[in-house]
């Protein structure tokens, strides 16, 4: 495999991995939002019993997961330079003609290097997103467990 083919393949892999992370985060936002709406829209938590404590804990945990998942989906470019030819935010800081000229006059080796650099930033982005999503899954599981315990106490006490 040629070096440029590998770099393009790696970039495609990273882009798909990031899309999948975003899809997971959006699914968690939807599922936990539905659970919150379904369980807590008509419930009045008064802390009179163990069931209410578990419900309140589940509510807080699921809110935290929605906030974290939204943070994972939040778009970022990772590159702080003002002008560049790779990241959309950097490209946007140039005029159309300036961008076209900059790409035209870049040497092939420099373009390859910039693409490799982008792959590095994409890998860091994917790593950060999946780190957050792992935490979201764990916190969601704790929230679901609290809801389960709440239901068990509701059955026992009724």
From Swiss-Prot:
Q: Name one GO molecular function term.
A: nucleotide binding
Main localization (coarse): membrane
User: Do you know which InterPro entries this protein is assigned to?
Assistant: PycTM (IPR043760)
Q: Which residues cross the membrane?
A: 20-40, 53-73, 136-156
The disulfides recorded in the entry are: none
Name the GO terms of the biological process aspect: defense response to virus
UniProt keyword annotations, A-Z:
Antiviral defense, Cell membrane, Membrane, Nucleotide-binding, Transmembrane, Transmembrane helix
Pfam families from the UniProt entry: PycTM
For membrane topology, the record states: Multi-pass membrane protein
Cellular component aspect of the GO annotation: plasma membrane
| Cellular localisation | Cell membrane
What is this protein for, i.e. what is its function?
Answer: Pycsar (pyrimidine cyclase system for antiphage resistance) provides immunity against bacteriophage. The pyrimidine cyclase (PycC) synthesizes cyclic nucleotides in response to infection; these serve as specific second messenger signals. The signals activate the adjacent effector, leading to bacterial cell death and abortive phage infection. A clade E Pycsar system.
| Protein name per UniProt | Pycsar effector protein SaPycTM
